C-alpha cells in the first residue's frame, strides 16, 4: 500500500466584504476569479463535510488534489443577488457557483459545493447588520432551506452571536471581539443552542460543522469541550481561519485549518503562490499509478531561472507496508541490518524530469515512525546519496536549499503522524542531526536523543516524555 502525505487546502470568503470593484476589495469578484483559477490549477472541489469525514477516518490521502470552499457569517449575499448602494449589483456566491456550472458543465468540478457558516441568533444578526454593514437588512435566515435544497451550499454553525465586539451584550462571558471560550457554560450558550436552532432553520437534520468566529481556537474548546460534547450534539468537526497550512493527516478534527481571502491573498496569483508554498497543489509530474511502472516523459522547458519548475513536483512521500522490499537495500547499506518491524514506514519517491537518462521513479530516502503512548519515535532515516549526482543542476540547487532529501522525508512523515504531542529522534551521525534540526527537532540534553514538540506542553510533561523516550533508546 502506498499513501501520499496529502495536503488539502480549505479557503473562505466573506460575501459581505464589498468595498470596491476588484479582487482585492470585493469577495464576490474574488470568489468568481479564484474558482476559475483553482480549476485551471487542477484542484477538485469537494464538500467540507467530506474533508472532515476523511480526516476523522484517517483517509485524507484519498483527497490528494482536492480543495474545500467556505463562506463566513451567512449574510444574504451568500444566496441572493443584492444591490449595493455604492458598488452596484452583486452576484451571490450561490449564483456564482451556478454560473460556473452553466459555463463548464457538470463534468468540470462534479462535486462543486461550498459551506456557509452562519451566525444563528436573529437578534444578533439584526444588530450586527446595523453596526457592521449599513443597516439595509442584509442578514436573514429565510434562504437557508432553499440553499440546502439547491444542493451546492450547506448551512453550518458560526456560533449563536459571534461574541462580536459590536454587540452590547452576548450570551458568552468571554472577552468581546474574540472567541477564546474557556468554560462549559459559555460553550453551551454559544454552540449547543446554535446547533439546535440551526437544524430547524436549514430544515436538515444530521451532523453540523462549526466555524470558529474570528478563527479563534481556544485550547478549552479544541482539546476538551468538543471531544467531550461533539458526539452528543451531532457536531462532526470545527474549522478555524487565517491559518498558515492546509489540512493534513495530523490536523485536529476540532481545529481544521482554513485560508482567508483578502487577509492571506488578494489576487489569483497570490492564491496560487500561497497554495504552492503550502505544498497543496497537485503534482502532475509525480503522479504514478504503479511505483515501478515506466511512465511517459512530460516535456519540461527551462528557459530561465525565474521559470524553473518547482522541485517538489518531482518528489512524493508515501507510507508503505512492504518497506523491506522497497527500501531494504538502502537501509542495509546505511545500518548493516534489515529494516526493523515498525508501525509506520515512509519512502521518498523521486520521479526524474523529462530528458533524464532514466524516467523510472525510484526510492531515494526512508524513515520509520513508531507510535507510543503520548509520543512517536522517529528513526532509521537514510538517504541514497548517489541520487544527488543524477539530479539536473537546477534541481540539485533547489533540493539543497530546501534542506536535502533527509529533511523532506522526515518533514513529510511528521505530517502523517496523527494526533501526537511529540516526536523523538535517535540521532547517531552529524548528517541526520543536521536534517532533524532543519525539520524542527531540538536537543533534549540526553546524548543522541532529539525531540520535536508538536503541541504546547507544560515543562513537567515534557520532562516526563523525555525520560520515557530515553528509556527506549536506541530505536
Cite the ranges covered by each PLM segment.
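Acyl-donor binding region in acyl/amide transferases
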Residues: 376-440, 444-446
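Terminal substrate-recognition subdomain of acyl/acetyltransferases
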Residues: 299-307, 419-475
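Alpha-helical scaffold elements lining the catalytic groove of polysaccharide deacetylases
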Residues: 139, 145-150, 161-202
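His/Asp/Glu-enriched short active-site or ligand-binding loop at hydrolase and phosphoryl-transfer sites
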Residues: 52, 201, 206-209, 214-267
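A conserved beta-strand-loop-helix scaffold within acyl/acetyltransferase catalytic domains
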Residues: 309-313, 318-386
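Active-site beta->alpha N-cap acidic-glycine motif
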Residues: 15-152, 163, 200, 206, ...
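Short, solvent-exposed beta-strand-terminating loops
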Residues: 1-3, 8, 155-167, 368-388
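Hydrophobic faces of well-ordered beta-strands that scaffold small-molecule active sites
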Residues: 9-11, 69-71, 114-116, 155-158, ...
Amino acid at each position: 500500500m502506498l499513501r501520499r502525505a496529502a495536503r488539502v487546502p480549505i479557503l473562505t470568503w466573506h460575501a459581505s466584504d464589498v468595498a470596491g470593484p476588484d479582487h482585492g476589495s470585493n469577495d464576490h469578484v474574488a470568489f468568481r476569479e479564484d474558482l476559475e483559477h483553482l480549476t485551471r490549477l487542477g484542484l477538485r472541489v469537494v464538500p467540507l463535510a467530506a474533508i472532515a469525514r476523511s480526516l476523522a477516518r484517517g483517509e485524507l490521502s484519498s483527497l490528494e488534489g482536492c480543495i474545500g470552499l467556505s463562506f463566513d457569517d451567512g449574510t444574504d449575499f451568500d444566496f441572493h443577488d443584492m444591490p449595493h448602494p455604492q458598488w452596484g449589483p452583486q452576484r451571490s456566491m450561490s449564483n456564482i457557483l451556478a454560473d460556473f456550472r452553466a459555463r463548464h458543465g457538470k463534468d468540470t468540478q462534479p462535486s462543486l459545493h461550498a459551506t456557509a457558516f452562519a451566525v444563528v441568533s436573529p437578534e444578533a444578526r439584526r444588530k450586527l447588520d446595523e453596526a457592521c454593514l449599513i443597516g439595509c437588512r442584509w442578514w436573514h435566515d429565510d434562504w437557508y432551506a432553499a440553499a440546502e435544497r439547491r444542493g451546492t451550499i450547506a448551512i453550518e454553525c458560526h456560533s449563536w452571536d459571534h461574541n462580536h465586539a459590536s454587540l452590547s451584550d452576548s450570551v458568552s462571558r468571554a472577552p468581546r471581539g474574540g472567541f477564546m471560550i474557556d468554560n462549559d457554560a459559555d460553550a453551551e450558550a454559544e454552540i449547543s443552542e446554535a446547533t439546535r436552532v440551526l437544524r430547524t432553520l436549514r430544515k436538515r437534520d444530521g451532523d453540523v460543522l462549526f466555524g470558529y468566529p474570528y478563527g479563534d481556537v481556544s485550547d478549552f474548546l479544541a482539546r476538551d469541550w468538543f471531544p467531550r460534547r461533539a458526539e452528543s450534539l451531532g457536531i462532526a468537526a470545527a474549522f478555524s481561519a487565517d491559518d498558515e497550512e492546509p489540512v493534513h493527516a495530523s490536523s485536529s478534527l476540532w481545529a481544521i485549518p482554513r485560508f482567508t481571502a483578502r487577509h492571506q491573498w488578494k489576487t489569483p496569483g497570490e492564491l496560487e503562490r500561497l497554495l504552492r508554498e503550502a505544498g497543496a497543489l497537485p503534482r502532475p509530474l509525480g503522479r504514478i499509478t504503479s511505483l515501478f511502472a515506466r511512465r511517459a516523459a512530460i516535456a519540461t522547458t527551462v528557459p530561465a531561472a525565474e521559470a524553473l519548475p518547482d522541485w517538489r513536483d518531482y518528489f512524493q512521500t508515501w507510507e508503505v507496508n512492504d518497506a523491506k522490499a522497497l527500501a531494504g537495500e538502502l537501509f542495509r547499506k546505511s545500518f548493516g541490518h534489515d529494516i526493523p518491524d515498525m508501525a509506520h514506514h515512509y519512502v521518498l519517491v523521486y520521479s526524474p524530469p523529462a530528458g533524464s537518462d532514466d524516467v523510472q521513479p525510484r526510492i531515494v530516502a526512508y524513515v520509520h515512525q513508531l507510535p507510543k503512548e503520548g509520543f512517536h519515535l522517529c528513526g532509521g532515516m537514510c538517504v541514497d546519496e548517489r541520487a544527488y549526482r543524477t539530479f539536473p543542476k537546477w534541481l540539485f540547487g533547489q533540493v539543497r536549499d530546501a534542506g536535502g532529501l533527509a529533511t523532506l522525508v522526515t518533514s513529510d512523515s511528521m505530517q502523517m503522524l496523527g494526533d501526537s504531542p511529540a516526536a523523538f529522534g535517535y540521532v547517531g551521525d552529524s548528517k541526520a542531526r543536521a536534517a532533524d534540526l532543519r525539520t524542527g527537532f531540538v536537543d533534549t540534553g540526553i546524548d543522541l536523543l532529539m525531540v520535536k514538540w508538536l503541541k504546547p506542553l507544560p515543562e513537567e510533561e515534557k520532562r516526563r516524555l523525555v525520560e520515557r523516550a530515553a528509556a527506549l533508546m536506541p530505536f
